[in-house]
């Protein structure tokens, strides 16, 4: 192999209802990436038990994510859609990466600090090792690119650190087995087995905020359902949530600079821009000077027109669980085949008998 074959990997946790932020920040980007890339999209159910071990309906949540992928336009025939626990090689490589990674690296992860809170001693070991499993998810396929939000950027940097340490520690074994690719890290040439993964960050609305508090990210775990637009919400519910969305008393500005220190206004304008594939400046050129009583109905109509086809197809798919299960099963078979190719070579590189 002279170079790493380009491959996109990403995953979504099956925890709670998917919402507009998940769609605009992740799933819509997945759909666009599949046009010109080889893609693997995963329902990361092993990650879902790191913070909450017992789920009321984990199978239903897994199917819901898969349905959202497909309803949004991801093609499970051309690309791979599967659930993580169906491919045991993820967990196998994660254990190896637990031995590669340093405890100090894990302790620096801000997401662990945020999720563990003040009671760090009571957090699960799985939550601490979450980034190691994420690295395995990506590298078990030797993926080269990962679409991520800002909140996962640090984890992706850790993935690169783990890959680099493995490559350097086992460089002679990799070279001897004829498995690697010659790359340059910094100014240092190395013979690498795992690629230096690149993040794909951006898009018009990578961070959609709560409809009730523009300083907080839209979240599945927010106790108020009015804080988010769920992908399964019907048109009337979407209209109600946008009508009740928190705003300020001032009119919309005519320029984007006027949104500074107005988080709720900036959030709603950003959502409109993302749904319409326009810039905030273009949206404000149309609505600047108008009150939210005019803007909110326009935003609601746009949201309904974009999301209703997805919602309808999700409902249809969720009514045929056998079809979703068949897609996940076939995707799992294809993913296992690729993952086992990697793990066979990793075992050889490390020196495990097979």
From Swiss-Prot:
Q: Which InterPro entries match?
A: aa-tRNA-synth_I_CS (IPR001412), aa-tRNA-synth_Ic (IPR002305), Rossmann-like_a/b/a_fold (IPR014729), Trp-tRNA-ligase (IPR002306), Trp-tRNA-ligase_bac-type (IPR024109), Trp-tRNA_synthetase (IPR050203)
Q: Where does L-tryptophan bind?
A: 137
What is the enzyme's class at the highest EC level?
A: ligase
Q: Which reaction does it catalyse?
A: tRNA(Trp) + L-tryptophan + ATP = L-tryptophyl-tRNA(Trp) + AMP + diphosphate + H(+)
Motif window: 'KMSKS' region: 217-221
User: Does the keyword section mention ATP-binding?
Assistant: yes
Question: Where does this chain carry the motif 'HIGH' region?
Answer: 14-22
Q: Which sites bind ATP?
A: 13-15, 21-22, 149-151, 208, 217-221
Annotated GO biological processes are:
tryptophanyl-tRNA aminoacylation
- Cellular component terms per the entry's GO annotation: cytosol
Subcellular location as annotated: Cytoplasm
E.C. number, please? 6.1.1.2
Q: Which terms does the record give in the GO molecular function aspect?
A: ATP binding; tryptophan-tRNA ligase activity
Q: Which UniProt keywords apply?
A: Aminoacyl-tRNA synthetase, ATP-binding, Cytoplasm, Ligase, Nucleotide-binding, Protein biosynthesis
Q: Which domain of life is it from?
A: Bacteria
Cited Pfam families: tRNA-synt_1b
Q: Quaternary arrangement and interactors, per the entry?
A: Homodimer.
Similarity field: Belongs to the class-I aminoacyl-tRNA synthetase family.
What is the documented function of this protein?
A: Catalyzes the attachment of tryptophan to tRNA(Trp).
Recorded protein name is Tryptophan--tRNA ligase
Species name: Rhizobium meliloti (strain 1021) (Ensifer meliloti)
Taxonomic path: Bacteria, Pseudomonadati, Pseudomonadota, Alphaproteobacteria, Hyphomicrobiales
